[in-house]
Amino acid sequence: MAKKSKIAKEKKRQKLVEQYAELRKELKEKGDYRALSKLPRDSAPARLHNRCEVTGRPRGYMRKFKMSRIAFRELAYKGQIPGVKKSSW
């Protein structure tokens, strides 16, 4: 389990990115890079890092399921992820 402060910081960044998305887009179209640089640093989408919804783990993230490989494996074995089953051939 990741530190709660790291998870909270990532959520805060996500909110800032959503809040400034329109303004950022307009400034980029105008080419006003000075105003862009005055926006909060955490409002840049490049600073976001995908984290597992279950554990908050930043590595081994599976985009399709929004969770880490470890949490995915545990939930898949329990049958708690719809449409996922153990393969056999």
Swiss-Prot record:
Q: Which SUPFAM superfamilies match?
A: Glucocorticoid receptor-like (DNA-binding domain)
Indicate what this protein is called per its UniProt record. Answer: Small ribosomal subunit protein uS14A
User: Pfam families given for it?
Assistant: Ribosomal_S14 (PF00253)
Q: Which GO terms describe its biological process?
A: translation
Molecular-function annotations in GO? rRNA binding; structural constituent of ribosome
Q: Which family does it belong to?
A: Belongs to the universal ribosomal protein uS14 family.
PROSITE patterns assigned to the protein according to its UniProt record, in alphabetical order: RIBOSOMAL_S14
Q: Which GO terms describe its cellular component?
A: cytoplasm; small ribosomal subunit
Gene3D superfamilies tied to this protein: 30s Ribosomal Protein S14, Chain N
Q: State whether it acts alone or in a complex, and with which partners, per the record.
A: Part of the 30S ribosomal subunit. Contacts proteins S3 and S10.
Q: Which domain of life is it from?
A: Bacteria
The UniProt entry, under NCBIfam families, shows: PRK08881.1
Keywords, alphabetical: Ribonucleoprotein, Ribosomal protein, RNA-binding, rRNA-binding
Write out the function statement from the record. Binds 16S rRNA, required for the assembly of 30S particles and may also be responsible for determining the conformation of the 16S rRNA at the A site.
